[in-house]
Amino acid sequence: MLSRKAVAALLLVHVTAMLASQTEGFVPIFTYSELRRTQEREQNKRLRKSLRVQQRSKAAGRLEPQEVMEEEENGVIKLTAPVEIGVGLSSRQLEKHRAVLEALLSEALPPPSLVFGGQRPVTAAWE
């Protein structure tokens, strides 16, 4: 038969396994030093932001913090890479929507006489 030590060891392993299956363990993702570093970075960001607000208020008269926040939220997004915007149409789609496209372009663009001094430019491939 099994010795007392073997039975006690098996019983201990079984009890430990049962307790482990019943409990929900928490393993921290970040260490204390990483959390502290993250908090310091956030605090530095806030300090830099408040410093920028103070500099702006000195340069452009007194601005309220709400006005500065609204100004930053409504800011223009500046692109750092070239962006190509275009529309591709097949010949069937072009024939179907030609009148609408010509109307939109005539509203959006000035007449050719104003742009090219009376000369008629080649404006599209379908002409």
Curated annotation (Swiss-Prot):
Tissue expr: Present in the gut mucosa with the exception of the gastric corpus. Also present in medulla oblongata, nucleus of the solitary tract, hypophysis, spinal cord, hypothalamus, and cerebellum but not in the cerebral cortex.
Keywords noted in UniProt: Cleavage on pair of basic residues, Hormone, Secreted, Signal
CC terms in the record's Gene Ontology section: extracellular region
Similarity comment: Belongs to the motilin family.
Pfam families referenced in this protein's UniProt entry, alphabetically: Motilin_assoc, Motilin_ghrelin
Signal peptide bounds: 1-25
GO molecular function, a single term: hormone activity
Residue numbers spanned by region Disordered: 41-67
Species whose genome carries this gene: Cavia porcellus
PANTHER family documented for this protein: MOTILIN, PROMOTILIN
Coarse class of the protein's main subcellular location: secreted
Record localization: Secreted
Function: Plays an important role in the regulation of interdigestive gastrointestinal motility and indirectly causes rhythmic contraction of duodenal and colonic smooth muscle.
Annotated protein name in UniProt: Promotilin
